């Protein structure tokens, strides 16, 4: 699959494909609205998103309580069918596929903030794409840095995301591979196909007291390590001003260690 050049129109599909759009920022987030509207120019789009923000929930699935799946006309999607779910991003994809029919593509985002390196392990945005992949559907996750003023302009990112999604609909993706796409904080210099790099967080816990003297805790994190100087990685590419497109394979086996580990295992 070829990543489209920003100056070259994408190939036209023979019929309007069906695209399921999800996110982790919630149904009212500006990124999913911009993405859904951009995709609707060439696809039949349906939006299924959490009713409240679900950032950093990872690939959680709700199994201990029922889920509510409600149509909403208040999220600003115009004629695009939009549904809110009181669950996780992965729940949204599961319900969207099973209740509304299998789409041709699952798209997640555009996330408020990047998802780079180890972020992929706890990102609800990426988890929605992973859930699409586990259901046998080509899937893409989109995330974006804020600009230097701390603001988000999703219009240009949504336009490129739409073109990339259309290319994937035309060409497909290899089995068990999704695309994780990150937009830089500046006007992009171009597009880079990248490796998932290093973006390590040091977890910290802030403890405070409520008015009754009881402790409560905030779990936070500080970015402590990254490979921002290596433009072949996702973090390095966006730091250099490029759109990062990382092919991510859903294969957790360290195959290069199977032989060595087999020899090292103690006998039963």
Curated annotation (Swiss-Prot):
Keyword Chloroplast: no
Gene3D superfamilies in alphabetical order: Survival protein SurE-like phosphatase/nucleotidase
Cofactor(s) needed: a divalent metal cation
Broad class of where this protein is predominantly found: cytoplasm
Reaction catalysis annotation: a ribonucleoside 5'-phosphate + H2O = a ribonucleoside + phosphate
Keyword Signal on entry: no
Keyword annotations from UniProtKB, A to Z: Cytoplasm, Hydrolase, Metal-binding, Nucleotide-binding
Protein EC: 3.1.3.5
Residues that hold a divalent metal cation according to the record: 24-25, 55, 111
Listed InterPro entries: SurE, SurE-like_Pase/nucleotidase, SurE-like_sf
Origin superkingdom: Bacteria
Top EC class, one word: hydrolase
Cofactor note: Binds 1 divalent metal cation per subunit.
GO cellular component: cytoplasm
Subcellular location as annotated: Cytoplasm
MF terms (GO), sorted A to Z: 3'-nucleotidase activity; 5'-nucleotidase activity; exopolyphosphatase activity; metal ion binding; nucleotide binding
Family label: Belongs to the SurE nucleotidase family.
Job description of the protein: Nucleotidase that shows phosphatase activity on nucleoside 5'-monophosphates.
NCBIfam families associated with the record: PRK00346.1-4 (NF001490), surE (TIGR00087)
Protein name: 5'-nucleotidase SurE
Source species: Deinococcus radiodurans (strain ATCC 13939 / DSM 20539 / JCM 16871 / CCUG 27074 / LMG 4051 / NBRC 15346 / NCIMB 9279 / VKM B-1422 / R1)
Name of the gene this protein is made from: surE
